[in-house]
């Protein structure tokens, strides 16, 4: 058994300010990698800039990361970073900016290399330091080595083959407080997917399942808010973010499985948000698991059966998807031996079609 999670995690209120010295110690010139607006609205960008200025650390802002970032975006940021002389990267936002930050850190260290380096398993590139500041409750990317990028050349999403764990993660639930409910819903469903897929996984271990158990208990305690019965509180925001971090710790060991593999086609071809695309396959995936594992997860999440789980996800994060797109997703994952191997039960064509057959769609 191996448990490797080298990220130093600070999880507390105002942690960017409280640990500004640790952030500033990563280098002398930061490339702040984020999306176009959310980090400006939730206050995280201001906190980071203040922290850097307090310690007289220079910074350059790259705020052009799109949802499901592309290799082309990584290369654009790499060129800016190299030209400005940055020596560390801060990813702030959801999974897209943090995943992009990891890939950018690799490419800045290899300024003459082409984008193919990110997917070249024969190479062993170095990278500059990375800090992560998550502002959604789904990615878990702040504690994983994975960077998922869009490959327009092959019309899908793919993980960079090189593992890049952030040096530090600064986790503060306050950045969720003004997020749109839809964003929280979709990312919370993604976190649930990480937790379920890590537990029902060929690579699951006592260490990864320990993280899952903690994460599911926290996630379940937030159901009154997620279902619309309560308003978002600071305590609930903290629990949602921490559940997501536990999910990241779990998939750092196991990786994700079939539902994530199925989701990529829906996101790329159907423009369906990642969390929502992952969520619609969870009940079908869990239904096929060993009875003891299935009952354990249902017990921790407070659902009586997989149908209840599926209905909750469908109400929380509704999706309208055609049968044709679902079938293309099935075909794609059946040609992904790595995702199939991560499933602890035989994931043949019959099983995959059964999983997509149980999808609950809106509209």
Could you describe each region identified by the protein language model?
Residues 265-320:
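Active-site pocket-lining segment
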Residues 298, 302-363:
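C-terminal charged capping/lid subdomain of soluble metabolic enzymes
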Residues 138, 248-273:
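Glycine-rich phosphate/pyrophosphate-binding beta-alpha loops
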Residues 146-254, 344:
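Carboxylate- and glycine-rich phosphate/diphosphate-binding segment that chelates Mg2+/Mn2+
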Residues 1-88:
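ATP/NTP phosphate-donor binding region
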Residues 72-174:
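Glycine/threonine-rich beta-strand-loop-alpha-helix active-site module
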Residues 16-19, 40-44, 71, 96-101, ...:
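Short glycine/serine/threonine-rich phosphate/pyrophosphate-binding segments
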């Amino acid at each position: 058994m191996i448990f490797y999670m080298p990220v130093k995690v600070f999880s507390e209120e105002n942690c960017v300010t409280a640990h500004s010295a640790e952030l500033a110690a990563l280098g002398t010139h930061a490339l702040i990698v984020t999306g176009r607006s959310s980090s400006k609205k939730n206050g995280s960008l201001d906190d980071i800039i203040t922290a850097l200025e307090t310690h007289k650390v220079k910074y350059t802002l790259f705020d052009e990361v799109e949802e499901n970032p592309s290799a082309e975006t990584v290369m654009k940021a790499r060129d800016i970073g190299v030209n400005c002389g940055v020596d560390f990267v801060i990813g702030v936002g959801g999974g897209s900016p943090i995943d992009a930050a990891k890939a950018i850190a690799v490419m800045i260290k290899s300024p003459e290399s082409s984008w193919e380096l990110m997917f070249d398993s024969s190479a062993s590139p170095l990278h500059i330091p990375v800090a992560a500041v998550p502002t959604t409750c789904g990615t878990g990317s702040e504690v994983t080595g994975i960077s998922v990028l869009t490959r327009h050349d092959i019309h899908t999403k793919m993980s960079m083959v090189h593992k890049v764990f952030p040096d530090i993660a600064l986790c503060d639930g306050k950045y969720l407080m003004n997020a749109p409910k839809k964003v929280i819903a979709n990312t919370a469903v993604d976190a649930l997917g990480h937790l379920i897929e890590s537990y029902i996984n060929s690579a699951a271990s006592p260490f990864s399942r320990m993280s899952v158990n903690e994460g599911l208990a926290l996630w379940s305690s937030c159901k009154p808010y997620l279902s619309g019965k309560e308003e978002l509180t600071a305590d609930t925001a903290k629990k949602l973010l921490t559940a997501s971090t536990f999910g990241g710790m779990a998939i750092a060991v196991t990786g994700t499985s079939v539902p994530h593999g199925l989701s990529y086609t829906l996101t790329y071809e159907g423009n369906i948000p990642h969390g929502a695309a992952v969520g619609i396959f969870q009940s079908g995936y869990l239904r096929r698991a060993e009875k003891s594992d299935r009952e354990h997860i249902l017990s921790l999440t407070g659902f009586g059966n997989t149908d209840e789980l599926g209905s909750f996800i469908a109400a929380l994060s509704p999706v309208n998807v055609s049968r044709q797109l679902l079938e293309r997703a099935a075909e794609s994952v059946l040609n992904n031996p790595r995702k199939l191997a991560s499933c602890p039960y035989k994931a043949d064509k019959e099983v995959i079609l059964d999983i997509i057959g149980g999808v609950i769609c809106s509209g």
